[in-house]
Amino acid sequence: MKKLKMKISTILILLLVFVTGCSSKKELKDGVYEGNYKDESATVKVVITIKDKKIVDCIREERDNKNNQIKDENYGKDDADFNYKQAQKAVKNSEGYAKKLVEVQDIEKVDSVSGATVSLKRFKSAVKDALNK
C-alpha cells in the first residue's frame, strides 16, 4: 500500500511540475518585432512594439495572395456586391485584433469575432512568429 501511495504521489508531483512549467508565460524583451504568416489565400504581417516588457503597439496588415491586395476598405470592390459585403464584414471584424492584443497582452486571450475567424488564426500565427524571435 505504501508503494502505491508513493507512486501516486510521485506522479502527481511530476504532473504538477509539468503543468506549471507549461503555463509560465515567456517574458517579453523590449524592441520591435516583425512576424509573418502565409497560407494559400492570404499573408499576414504584424509589427509589434515591446516597451517595459509589455506590448505597447501592434500593427497588422493582411493581403490577399491572389492579387496582392491589402484587405482594407477597398478590398473586394471589384467583386460582386455580395462578395464585397462579405469581404468588408471580415475586414471590419478583424480590425480590432491588434488593439485587443495590446489590451490583453496575450495572444491566446484575443477572442474570435464572427466573420473573421480565419483572420484571427492567421493573426495569431503571425504574432507567435514575431514574439518567438
Regions found by a protein language model. Give the residues of each.
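Bacterial N-terminal signal peptides that target proteins for export
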Residues: 2-9
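Compositionally biased regions
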Residues: 10-11, 24
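Cell-envelope/extracellular anchoring and linker segments
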Residues: 14-16
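Active-site- and interface-proximal helix/loop "cap" or "latch" segments in soluble metabolic
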Residues: 26-28, 34-133
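C-terminal motif of bacterial Sec signal peptides marking the signal peptidase cleavage site
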Residues: 18-21
